[in-house]
Amino acid sequence: MNSPSESRVPSSLTQDPSFTASPALLQGIWNSTQNISVRVQLLSVSPTTPGLQAAAWVPFPTVDVPDHAHYTLGTVILLVGLTGMLGNLTVIYTFCRNRGLRTPANMLIINLAVSDFLMSFTQAPVFFASSLYKKWLFGETGCKFYAFCGAVFGIVSMITLTAIAMDRYLVITRPLATIGMRSKRRTALVLLGVWLYALAWSLPPFFGWSAYVPEGLLTSCSWDYVTFTPLVRAYTMLLFCFVFFLPLLIIIFCYIFIFRAIRETGRACEGCGESPLRRRQWQRLQSEWKMAKVALIVILLFVLSWAPYSTVALVGFAGYSHILTPYMSSVPAVIAKASAIHNPIIYAITHPKYRAAIAQHLPCLGVLLGVSGQRSHPSLSYRSTHRSTLSSQSSDLSWISGQKRQESLGSESEVGWTDTETTAAWGAAQQASGQSFCSHDLEDGEVKAPSSPQEQKSKTPKTKRHLPSLDRRM
């Protein structure tokens, strides 16, 4: 570690019994020792410095920080990990157990819970164990695998949140377009694309484009955002553009148009007067908007959790890694991993059907949430309309008007329609047959058709008519 210019004491002199060290020589030896100590400390704090990466692996370096710093971070990450695993496992179990929650839209929520569960499962125990020993314990291969898992599951969560925002955008602004699109099979293909996209951005460090290295207090690993080389900086720049900033812009775009659609629909409903239709349409839109707000809260918390870590990485990308301390890297990393606990907590507080399902399948947890099992069953009704109902030419209005709100756990059809989609489909069909948009009345499978002038004169209580035809392949 010593440079040629540093003061050294020849071994031949130290072995001479008559040798006496002068004060000046002792001071030179002390200065040389101090230089060695400082250089070793710099090497341990910045293992990603160019030219020193290979030396950082054997043995793994440590950072000269108080022991309580390691223990505190280790305890926090353990609590975060346990909460994330138990909470997301509850979400997965509840959504999969309840038929009324197994819809194409909720498949995205289940995927988010799966990625958050795996994030907590793969990151927290390893981080905690290394913090107890105040150094990385799992070797170079373990470091790469740990960082790879963190990258994959973090990217999957971000892209899944983007897909949720797009789903809410389509349901609220273009409900007719989603009738034939939102099937479980197509949603599964979307989720497959999400995982492949995450793998595409997580595998390059294994092949020499950037690297997975220790970071912060050197008890966790991440991709190399410190090395100031064109190849590493290019990977960091593209990663931020296509994994963070672009999805964030898409989410902002979706919610801007959701706000506009709700405002315009509210104004349109005002022209219908104080009719039951107006109230029901507004209630349906409000229901969809409540779900959109839940998704928006999850997205905002996720972005806020990753913002400090992204800032640290961008500082390293800009070439100012020398101002980053071990704490400045480790604390944001813990905050980012805490994003895995937001999803189950928010849904347990704000999602009425999820709360009711918990009360039914997990009564003990339902008591903690203040939800009664007996009272929750009616709210589990999954309101949907079969495509065959709208596509059948032989269905009459008297049969439809006899259908009341389903008090079951769900429809077995592949496509679960929301209230907004059903309203839009019926409204478009009525418009195609020359009827006014404000003249029909539809609520959860109950349809009341307007009567023609001849029917009003004859005051016929019921008239059989056929629904407009819709393609069965929608």
Curated annotation (Swiss-Prot):
Domain of life assignment: Eukaryota
Cystine connections: C143-C221
Keyword annotations from UniProtKB, A to Z: Biological rhythms, Cell membrane, Cell projection, Chromophore, Disulfide bond, G-protein coupled receptor, Glycoprotein, Membrane, Photoreceptor protein, Receptor, Retinal protein, Sensory transduction, Transducer, Transmembrane, Transmembrane helix
Cytoplasmic face of the membrane: 94-107, 166-188, 260-293, 373-474
Keyword Repeat in annotation: no
One Gene Ontology biological process: optokinetic behavior
Record topology, Extracellular segments: 1-72, 129-144, 210-238, 315-355
Keyword Transmembrane: yes
Protein localization: Cell membrane; Cell projection, Axon; Cell projection, Dendrite; Perikaryon
Signal peptide region: none
Chain spans, region Disordered: 428-474
Gene Ontology CC: one annotated term: sperm head plasma membrane
GO molecular function: 11-cis retinal binding; G protein-coupled photoreceptor activity
Parts of the chain that traverse the membrane: 73-93, 108-128, 145-165, 189-209, 239-259, 294-314, 356-372
Glycan attachment sites: N31, N35
Chain positions with N6-(retinylidene)lysine modification: K337
Expression sites by tissue: Eye; expressed in a photosensitive subset of retinal ganglion cells (at protein level).
Membrane topology: Multi-pass membrane protein
UniProt function note: Photoreceptor that binds cis-retinaldehydes. Contributes to pupillar reflex, photoentrainment and other non-image forming responses to light. May be involved in the optokinetic visual tracking response. May be involved in the regulation of retinal hyaloid vessel growth and regression.
The family this protein is said to belong to: Belongs to the G-protein coupled receptor 1 family. Opsin subfamily.
Protein name, as recorded: Melanopsin
Source organism: Rattus norvegicus
